[in-house]
């Protein structure tokens, strides 16, 4: 009788574990699904100077070997956008003022401007920070909450955590206060 109960209990235990294991396996995404999801969050952008900027963006975290250790402002803009033009001097000023702590990456968004015209525009607005061009820009805009209106900017702390989202032109005082606060926390 003891052996029968022991056998029955053991059989019951293994049967329960087997069903649970099947459920866990069924509900767990496959390696290829996880890899695909990860690859969809990796962006390889090219600047007007041909430099590559790579980063991963997922769940309000920005990870990049290219941008590591700095406060990063990702800015979506277009040359035809008046509010975008309004904030460019702010970015240039703060990039010059905090070169070791702060970097702007401007992503050209829905702007069919030629390379020569873009170079002239950047010179006119004294853009001393990278501007990315190319096919991946649209994919980045989709990853950042499917951007539809510009300018739109995202500020990330040195550890890659998003600190602030700006819709419309960025206010210089607000941005500088955030940079100083983050820089001093380092």
Write out the residue ranges for each language-model feature.
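N-terminal targeting signals for export/organelle localization
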Residues: 1-53, 184-186
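A short beta-strand-turn-helix
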Residues: 44-72
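Conserved redox-active cysteine motifs that mediate thiol-disulfide chemistry
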Residues: 68, 76-93
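Active-site acidic short loop of glycosyltransferases
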Residues: 68-70, 100, 127-128
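Short pre-active-site segment immediately N-terminal to redox-active cysteine/selenocysteine motifs
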Residues: 70-72, 76-80, 111, 149
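Conserved hydrophobic packing residues within short motifs/helices of P-loop NTPase cores
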Residues: 74, 105-107, 154
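Structural microenvironment flanking redox-active thiols in thiol-disulfide oxidoreductases
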Residues: 85-125, 136-141
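Thiol/disulfide oxidoreductase modules built on the thioredoxin-like
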Residues: 123-128, 134-181
């Amino acid at each position: 009788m003891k052996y029968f109960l022991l056998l029955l209990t053991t059989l019951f235990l293994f049967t329960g574990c087997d069903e649970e294991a099947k459920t866990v396996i069924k509900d767990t995404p496959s390696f290829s699904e996880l890899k695909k999801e990860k690859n969809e969050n990796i962006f390889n952008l090219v600047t007007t100077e041909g430099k590559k900027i790579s980063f991963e963006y997922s769940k309000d975290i920005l990870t990049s070997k290219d941008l590591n250790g700095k406060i990063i402002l990702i800015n979506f803009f277009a040359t035809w956008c008046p509010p975008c033009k309004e904030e460019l001097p702010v970015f240039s000023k703060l990039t010059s003022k905090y070169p070791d702590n702060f970097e702007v990456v401007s992503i050209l968004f829905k702007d069919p401007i030629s390379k020569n015209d873009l170079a002239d525009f950047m010179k006119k607005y004294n853009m001393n920070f990278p501007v990315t061009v190319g096919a991946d820009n649209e994919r980045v805009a989709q990853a950042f909450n499917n951007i539809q209106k510009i300018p739109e900017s995202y500020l990330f702390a040195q550890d890659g955590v998003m600190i602030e989202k700006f819709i419309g032109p960025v206010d210089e005082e607000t941005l500088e206060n955030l940079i100083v606060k983050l820089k001093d926390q380092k």
